[in-house]
Amino acid sequence: WIGLTFLIFYVLMFVLHAKDYYLAPIYPVLFAAGAIAWERRFATRPLVAAERVFAFPILEAALILTGLLVLPMTSPILRPAAWVRYTTALHLKSNKTETTSSGELPQFYADRFGWQQQVAIVARTFNSLSPADQHRVCIFAGNYGEAGAIDFFNRRDHLNLPPAISGHNNYWLWGMHGCDPDLVIAVIDDSPDDISKKYESVTIVGVRDTPYAMPFEHGNIYLLRGRRPSAPVNWADERHYY
């Protein structure tokens, strides 16, 4: 059943164009089951019994050395600069491990960077507002990672920010939480010229520039005031799933 389960999920992941590491957790189970099957089949053979005293220490040493070699791929034990040298030396460097190209680091590593800087700018901007504006402001993020970072650090550090809103995935379902789209702190990658078509006042309050973050997480953070009557808010238009 283990082998059949793997085959079924492999086909499903292939058809759905899933990310390559989604099946990774099942491989240790397959290796363990395969090892038992091989041992039952070959352990009693005279040649295997005679040479196992040498074979097992060699195998164990190979497993330990290989495990140490690939350990940085499974645990964040290296600093970013050391990681880049490591992957370059082993020819493992790839700038596209998910749906978009990354910079120096693959996305699963790059996505660990930049969130504190982003939230610090948002919190500073929020605290610069009057109490009345703080009560009504929207904090809008372009994707669930940005919105999730705001909500996470808001709770952890007691920043007293309103909930982040976003049109991305489940955040769209949670709506706008009653905030006023006439005043927005926006973490988006749109240009000031494009935003000015929707808002009368567009102020850059900070720049996201953490070196090792994903390229699309570099950009401006805005304070927007005065939604133009020619561009009314339609929450349904903000919905995007990927």
Predicted regions and their residues:
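Membrane-interface helix-loop-helix junctions at transmembrane boundaries of multi-pass membrane enzymes
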Residues: 1-4
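Hydrophobic/aromatic-rich transmembrane helices and adjacent perimembrane loops
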Residues: 7-49, 54-55
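Short phosphate-engaging motifs
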Residues: 21, 146, 191
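Signature aromatic-anchored transmembrane alpha helix within multi-pass, membrane-resident enzymes
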Residues: 41-86
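Short periplasmic/luminal acceptor-recognition loop of GT-C membrane glycosyltransferases, typified by
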Residues: 71-76, 85-171
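Aromatic/acidic, Gly/Pro-rich catalytic loop(s) in extracytoplasmic/lumenal soluble domains
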Residues: 117, 121, 130, 157-242
